[in-house]
Regions:
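Intrinsic structural disorder
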Residues: 1, 17-18, 51, 85
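Active-site beta->alpha loop and helix N-cap motifs at the rims of alpha/beta catalytic domains
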Residues: 1-15, 65
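Flexible, glycine/proline-enriched loop segments at strand-loop-helix junctions
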Residues: 1-3, 25-31
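Short alpha-helical segments used as structural interaction elements across diverse proteins
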Residues: 7, 23-25, 42, 106
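Catalytic domains of carbohydrate-active enzymes, especially glycoside hydrolases
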Residues: 13-25
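Catalytic core of soluble alpha/beta enzymes
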Residues: 30-178
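A glycine-rich beta-turn/hairpin centered on an aromatic-Pro dipeptide
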Residues: 181-182
């Protein structure tokens, strides 16, 4: 998800992923106007059709140098963008809002049929308890490196499963982070 590419390069990547047998591709939304991302990702989805599922990472829960910042997307924008992605058949929208806006995330989730994913930047079990209590996500993505290690991840996976939610480990770090996620 980290790389930013032109639509033609993304289409080439998608074709290669299909040839290599991948079932899903995650793309990063990064434009100031998220509807520009909807347009680009819609073109890619139109190209691949049902041959490749596409999910989108909005990167709205990010923090840099240890300092949390408020996401650019508010609830209204997140709902509108979600509905636009719904219309083009995206599998899930990841990190569409600030990860500590529990009420806003819950409202977003109720406002769309699109699967909402997140939690990679939340840390420790008590934060996931709040996310689950508010029913913020369909897909919980704890990052083993960023949020407390193996034991914390196992606990969150069990909590998500108990609530009939999907848990999929997240990683955006080095090879050891990927290995730990498995």
């Amino acid at each position: 998800t980290g790389s930013l590419k032109y639509v033609e390069e993304r289409i080439e990547d998608a074709d290669r992923f299909i040839e290599e047998g991948f079932k899903m591709m995650k793309l990063r939304a990064h434009h100031d106007d998220p509807f520009e991302d909807v347009k680009i990702i819609g073109a890619i989805k139109a190209h691949v059709g049902d041959k490749l599922k596409i999910s989108v990472d909005a990167n709205q829960g990010w923090f840099f140098t240890g300092k949390r910042t408020v996401a650019k997307w508010d609830l209204k924008k997140a709902v509108n963008v979600s509905k636009a992605f719904e219309d083009i058949g995206i599998e899930w929208l990841e990190e569409p809002m600030y990860g500590y806006d529990f009420e806003g995330l819950a409202e977003l989730r109720k406002s769309t049929t699109l699967n909402i994913a997140g939690g990679e930047l939340n840390a420790q079990v008590h934060e996931y308890r709040e996310l689950l209590k508010h029913n913020c996500f369909d897909i919980y993505q704890m990052d083993v490196v960023l949020s407390g290690g193996f034991v914390q991840n196992r606990k969150v996976a069990a909590m998500a499963e108990a609530e009939n939610k999907i848990y999929t480990p997240h990683t955006w770090t080095h090879g050891m982070g990927l290995a730990a996620a498995f």
